[in-house]
Amino acid sequence: MAMTYHLDVVSAEQQMFSGLVEKIQVTGSEGELGIFPGHAPLLTAIKPGMIRIVKQFGHEEFIYLSGGILEVQPGSVTVLADTAIRGQDLDEARALEAKRKAEEHIKSSHGDVDYAQASAELAKAIAKLRVIELTKKAM
């Protein structure tokens, strides 16, 4: 039997996941993180993107995170997300429209603030589309 640890993924609205996992993959403030059983304690910010959860027995789940905090403790990991949406609950048409609008804003931005905000919106839309794509493949 594979080694596991307990994972909780919660947002301000609801608890998205609670259970035993073999590993997770998430984007932290310093880059990609793979958290396996026995990982050293860690507290870090999470960038907008996805969390890839490999549950006990190898089943995968993908959740979009708009940002948040990751805490790793012996035997348990907690993700406190600003916003969390399961891959199957994301609207592909809406994400494509958000991506298109963000690309338009980037082209028409007139200052650093406009560009930074549009870039952040584009990154979120691309992350949502990636979660949708991976969720479809996993089904």
From Swiss-Prot:
Membrane-topology descriptor: Peripheral membrane protein
CDD domains tied to this protein: F1-ATPase_delta (cd12152)
Keyword Hydrolase attached: no
Cellular component, GO, one term: plasma membrane
Compartments (UniProt record): Cell inner membrane
Gene3D superfamilies cross-referenced by the UniProt entry: ATP synthase delta/epsilon subunit, C-terminal domain, F0F1 ATP synthase delta/epsilon subunit, N-terminal
InterPro entries named among the record's database cross-references: ATP_F1_dsu/esu_C_sf, ATP_synth_F1_dsu/esu, ATP_synth_F1_dsu/esu_N, ATP_synth_F1_esu_C, ATPsynth_dsu/esu_N
Keyword terms: ATP synthesis, Cell inner membrane, Cell membrane, CF(1), Hydrogen ion transport, Ion transport, Membrane, Transport
GO molecular function, one term: ATP binding
Main subcellular location of this protein, as a coarse class: membrane
Membrane spanning residue stretches: none
Pfam families named in the record: ATP-synt_DE, ATP-synt_DE_N
Subunit description: F-type ATPases have 2 components, CF(1) - the catalytic core - and CF(0) - the membrane proton channel. CF(1) has five subunits: alpha(3), beta(3), gamma(1), delta(1), epsilon(1). CF(0) has three main subunits: a, b and c.
Family label: Belongs to the ATPase epsilon chain family.
Role description: Produces ATP from ADP in the presence of a proton gradient across the membrane.
UniProt name for this protein: ATP synthase epsilon chain
Natural source organism: Enterobacter sp. (strain 638)
Taxonomy of the source species: Bacteria, Pseudomonadati, Pseudomonadota, Gammaproteobacteria, Enterobacterales
